[in-house]
């Protein structure tokens, strides 16, 4: 593999109610990504707790610390970097929705906090404007979390100034049910516009299912890779759990892709065809 090629694993993992199960899924995906030669495993928003009505039960410091330790240990054991979503805890019981960058030695390099919260999230979490650009694997990585894609006026000036090579977009996104359907969905079109304006690639890492309202799962998943030109390079399967291992050249053009479906528990199937069906 050329030194200019970055092999990423986009981990569109099935969301579970229990943090232990989500963490097992994350660690299994990290192991798979390493086995396939990926440099980094990318995981969704609140990877370890999930996004559901039991979040208050899961978002406990001792539990989250243990789950995050397990992910860091998996990175160190398999010599692979990862980005993972987990709450962070501040003074006075303050909680943030955060995204953590971990290197191939298991060290925590940086943490990004979500600023643009939904109304339900704001009843439990606190917004925080911590959005560093992280140098890792020869690239500069930016982050926006889930519905922050709607905050274009705040994001675009920052990304233009910070000039990240890639922006990670972990979330639990789906089309607005009250609006006409578009192809690609409106939230993806907004990301394409942001990529063009800021000359950055964007990698979406989306949950493929919804737990509070299972009927919404039909429109979940479909994570995307968007090039600096705004071109939609790759779309993962709709409403399917699995891991996509993708080679990107220095110009953010996919050179190779493979799909591994997630089966029962934390098991993944063999390499499947691309594009996956």
Language-model regions: role of each:
Residues 90-170, 176-189, 245, 252-265:
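Active-site catalytic loop in hydrolytic enzyme cores
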Residues 3-9:
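Extreme N-terminal starter segment of soluble prokaryotic enzymes
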Residues 63-83, 150-242:
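CN hydrolase (nitrilase-like) catalytic-core segments centered on the catalytic cysteine
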Residues 24-38, 153-162:
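Short amphipathic alpha-helices and their capping/turn segments at secondary-structure boundaries
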Residues 19, 27-105, 173-201:
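Cys-nucleophile CN-hydrolase/nitrilase-fold catalytic domain and related Cys-dependent amidase chemistry
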Residues 12-17:
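Short polar catalytic/cofactor-binding loops
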Residues 49, 56, 100, 112-118, ...:
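Short beta->alpha transition motifs characteristic of CBS
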């Amino acid at each position: 593999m050329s030194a200019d090629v970055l092999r990423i694993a986009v981990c569109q993992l099935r969301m579970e109610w229990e943090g232990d199960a989500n963490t097992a899924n994350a660690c299994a995906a990290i192991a798979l990504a390493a086995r396939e030669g990926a440099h980094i495993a990318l995981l969704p928003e609140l990877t370890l707790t999930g996004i559901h009505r039991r979040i208050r039960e899961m978002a406990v410091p001792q539990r989250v610390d243990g789950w995050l330790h397990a992910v860091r240990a998996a990175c160190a054991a398999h010599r692979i970097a990862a980005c993972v979503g987990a709450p962070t805890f501040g003074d006075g019981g303050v909680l943030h929705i955060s995204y953590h960058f971990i290197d191939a030695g298991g060290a925590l390099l940086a943490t990004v906090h979500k600023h643009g919260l939904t109304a339900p999230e704001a009843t439990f979490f606190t917004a925080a404007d911590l959005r560093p650009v992280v140098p890792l694997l020869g690239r500069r990585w930016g982050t926006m979390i889930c519905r922050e894609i709607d905050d274009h006026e705040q994001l675009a000036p920052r990304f233009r100034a910070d000039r990240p090579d890639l922006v990670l977009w972990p979330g639990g996104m789906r089309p607005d049910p009250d609006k006409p359907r578009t192809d690609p969905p409106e939230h993806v079109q907004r990301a394409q516009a942001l990529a063009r304006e800021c000359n950055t690639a964007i990698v979406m890492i989306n949950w493929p299912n919804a737990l509070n309202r299972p009927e919404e799962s039909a429109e979940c998943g479909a994570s995307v890779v968007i090039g600096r030109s705004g071109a939609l390079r790759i779309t993962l399967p709709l409403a399917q759990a699995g891991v996509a291992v993708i080679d990107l050249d220095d110009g953010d053009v996919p050179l190779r892709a493979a799909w591994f479906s997630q089966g029962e528990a934390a098991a993944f199937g063999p390499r499947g065809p691309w594009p996956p069906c």
